[in-house]
Amino acid sequence: MYDIKRLEAGQQKLQQAQQPLGLDLSGQQQQLTCSVITAPEHRANPNPSSISQSNPSEATHMTLLTLRRRRSLQRRACLLSILAAFVFGMALGVVVPMFGLPRHQDSPPDLPEEQIQMVAVEPLSSYRVEFIKETDELSAEQVFRNAFHLEQDKDAPDSMVVKKLDTNDGSIKEFHVQRTASGRYRKGPERRLSKKMPERVQPQETSRSPTTSPTNPTSEHQAGFIEEDVYWGPTVEQALPKGFAAKDQVSWERFVGEQGRVVRLEQGCGRMQNRMVVFADGTRACARYRQNTDQIQGEIFSYYLGQLLNISNLAPSAATVVDTSTPNWAAALGDITQAQWKERRPVVLTRWLSDLEPAGIPQPFQPLERHLNKHDVWNLTRHMQSERQAQSQPHGLLKRLGAASSPGSAHQSNAIEETGTGTETANGALVQRLIELAQWSDLIVFDYLIANLDRVVNNLYNFQWNADIMAAPAHNLARQSASQLLVFLDNESGLLHGYRLLKKYEAYHSLLLDNLCVFRRPTIDALRRLRAAGAGRRLRDLFERTTSAGVRDVLPSLPDKSVKILVERIDRVLGQVQKCQGS
């Protein structure tokens, strides 16, 4: 019995001695890095007594200390490498450029002319533009004089690229401009797109210096064309087409308001809901109908402004109201419904003109020659006189046949009688050219005052995409075939809608006015009287006097904001006349 108990006690001690060994072995299996040191010793001596004598817990503790030291050394080495890389980068990126590398020259070396020409054709980048200081801001006249191409910058709505002709050396330059909130411009650096042509300067100056001796027949002949260097002379004024007089306007207003009975509406007269109105007596008119009354106001008040300035190139117009309950509109009820016109809406009725043909832009207003002054008139006079002298000399049969078959200038006056002597024909051709230019001077002044977007400015704006558009007929401009009268059509964008878009299109308006230095004296005199009497008051009085109470109920008068802008633009035109007189 005693032996059995001693045997069981010995077995329990042996089991207790093996339990720590099992824990150490399991721990060694979980930590693979420690098993590399202790595992071979355990596998080589499987005897339990020898395992207990080797003290495995002490070996495990030493292994963990070695692993911690190794990790600590790795962290320190990593931090030291990061610090060394940072110091090296600082030295390479900052210290070396400041002290170690040579500086570039302040001014680049002179390049050959061929290389300069190659550099000049590189496209401009908006981020390379450096505008001048605010104190050196320029006016539209200073920026756009002699400019022949404007291109809106897509990335910057207030900026545009300007190409202009340098009159000093005949070269073409390009630069950026930026419009400021004050309406002035900041100009970027210029770059030359073409070579200087100094050989052109002397002939140009010579041609612009005609002799003023009273014995010179050329000067005597020019005296009737230009007066005081800025006005068209009596020869041109007396030859101008009569146009539409004040009595035509009075009779048309009476006809529309009292006598006219609309019988039907027909398609025509432009876009959208405009219609051709046919009256009972066969009279026709173009009806301008818009959902927005601003364009109706612009059309009728632009016409009133033309009347106050004695510009006879505007067809008679009158404002009325669509009301099928009245005898004037009752017969056209079906056509009005089909046209989707609404009752009690204002319309502008303009007398229909049947003998109209397209009118082009004269050469003096096309790029690169967009200017008209006394020198241009003198040069044109001398040129046509030299042609007349050449034609007066006897020619052979083949030369006469060739001259007879040569085509005339596109979009120019063709109403010259082919009877009479060659001298009379040449004089008639010269006067016809000057008549067209005189009417264009009124057109430029009128469109600038009302800020019309739908005529020449339309061509100028689209010139950046279509270079041939300036040679095409002008938008909303026509010519009467018989009288050669230019008719200014479609002025609905004037005075209101055009004023809202001045920030975008003012450069194009100023471009035309700044290059005009020959005006009609009656127009400028009327403009001075209008400025003194008050443009807003005169326009509103004319509106009250010529429209019915029904029209005034649905069509507002001219806003004060438009009147203020109009007065500013009147001063701008008068300032341009004064500047031309001093030049």
UniProtKB/Swiss-Prot annotation:
Enzyme class: transferase
Region spans: Disordered: 179-222, 384-421
Keywords per UniProt: Glycoprotein, Golgi apparatus, Kinase, Membrane, Notch signaling pathway, Secreted, Serine/threonine-protein kinase, Signal-anchor, Transferase, Transmembrane, Transmembrane helix, Wnt signaling pathway
GO CC, one annotated term: extracellular space
Transmembrane spans: 79-99
Gene Ontology MF term list: protein serine kinase activity; protein serine/threonine kinase activity; Wnt-protein binding
PTM field: Proteolytically cleaved to yield a secreted protein.
Enzyme Commission number: 2.7.11.1
Residues bearing carbohydrate: 310, 379, 491
Descriptive protein name: Extracellular serine/threonine protein kinase four-jointed
